C-alpha cells in the first residue's frame, strides 16, 4: 500500500503479466487472483520480458460490472465501484446502496468473469455466505476480531453492520422489519443512520417516528438523512 513502490510497473516489466481492462494485474493461469509485492535486494537479474500479453478484444469484466465502473478501458471509476464503497468510511450514496444488492463485503464480478482467472475461482471462492442477523447482533469489536483480515474503516465493526443493514434491506425477509426497528435504539449513530434508510427501503419509513426520538436526536447526520428520505417520499406521491 506504499505509493512509493512501483509494484505494477515492476510486475509488467518483469514479464509476470499485464494490466487488464479491469485495472487488475493479470497472469496466465491465475488471472487477477493474486497479490503482488516487491522484495528489494542488492543484485541485478537478467529477465527475458514478454510483451505480448493483453486482454485483446475481451471485455467481460466491463460487461459484468453491475454499475459501469469499468466502462472506460484500464480505468476504474471508484465512485461507481461497489467494493470501494463497502470499504469506505464515507456515507454511501442512495443510488449505490441500491446497487450493492445482497453484497456484504466487496464485489468480485470483474474477477470472476476474467477468462485467465477461471482456475482460481474454485480455489479462492469457496464459501461466500454470511449470517447478516448474526453480524447485526454482534458487538463492534467482536466483528473486528472475527473479520480481522478485512480492511475495516477505522477498525470499527459498525461499518460491517452498515454493510449488513444495506444487504438486508435490499433482500428483506419476514423478520427484517423487527430487526431494523431494534437497531434504531443502537448507541451507534452509524447503525441508526442506515437503519432509518433500511426501513425506508422496505416501505416502513413511517414507523421511524414511533421508535426514534427525532425531536431530541442530536446527530446532524441522522437528522439530515431523515429529512432527505422524508422529502423523497413526498416527492414521489
Report residues per predicted region.
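Catalytic cores of enzyme domains
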Residues: 1-132
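Alpha-helical scaffold segments
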Residues: 118-122, 219, 223-225, 229
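Flexible internal linker/loop segments at domain or repeat junctions
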Residues: 127-158
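Amphipathic alpha-helical scaffolding segments comprising HEAT/armadillo-like alpha-solenoid repeats
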Residues: 129-132, 142-146, 173-185, 204-215, ...
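Short inter-helical turns and helix N-cap capping residues of alpha-solenoid HEAT/ARM repeat scaffolds
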Residues: 157, 187-188, 216-222
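Structural detector for internal amphipathic alpha-helices that build alpha-solenoid repeat scaffolds
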Residues: 161-171, 192-202, 224-236
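Alpha-helical protein-protein interaction scaffolds
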Residues: 180-184, 188-196
Amino acid at each position: 500500500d506504499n505509493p512509493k513502490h512501483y509494484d505494477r510497473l515492476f510486475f509488467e516489466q518483469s514479464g509476470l503479466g499485464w494490466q487488464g481492462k479491469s485495472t487488475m494485474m493479470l497472469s496466465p493461469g491465475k488471472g487477477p487472483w493474486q497479490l503482488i509485492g516487491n522484495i528489494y535486494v542488492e543484485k541485478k537479474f537478467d529477465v527475458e520480458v514478454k510483451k505480448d500479453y493483453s486482454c485483446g478484444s475481451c471485455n467481460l469484466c466491463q460487461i459484468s460490472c453491475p454499475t459501469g465502473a469499468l466502462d472506460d478501458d484500464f480505468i476504474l471509476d471508484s465512485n461507481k465501484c461497489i467494493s470501494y464503497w463497502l470499504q469506505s468510511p464515507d456515507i454511501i450514496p442512495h443510488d449505490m446502496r441500491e446497487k450493492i444488492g445482497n453484497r456484504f463485503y466487496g464485489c468480485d464480478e470483474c474477477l470472476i468473469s476474467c477468462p485467465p482467472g477461471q482456475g482460481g475461482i474454485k480455489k479462492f471462492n469457496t464459501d461466500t455466505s454470511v449470517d447478516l442477523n448474526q453480524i447485526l447482533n454482534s458487538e463492534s469489536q467482536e466483528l473486528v476480531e472475527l473479520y480481522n483480515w478485512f480492511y475495516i474503516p477505522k477498525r470499527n465493526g459498525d461499518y460491517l453492520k452498515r454493510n449488513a443493514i444495506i444487504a438486508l434491506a435490499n433482500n428483506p425477509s419476514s423478520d427484517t422489519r423487527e430487526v431494523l426497528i431494534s437497531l434504531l435504539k443502537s448507541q451507534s449513530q452509524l447503525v441508526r443512520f442506515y437503519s432509518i434508510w433500511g426501513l425506508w427501503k422496505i416501505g416502513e419509513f413511517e414507523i421511524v417516528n414511533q421508535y426514534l426520538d427525532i425531536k431530541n436526536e442530536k446527530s446532524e447526520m441522522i437528522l439530515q438523512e431523515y429529512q432527505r428520505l422524508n422529502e423523497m417520499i413526498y416527492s414521489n406521491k
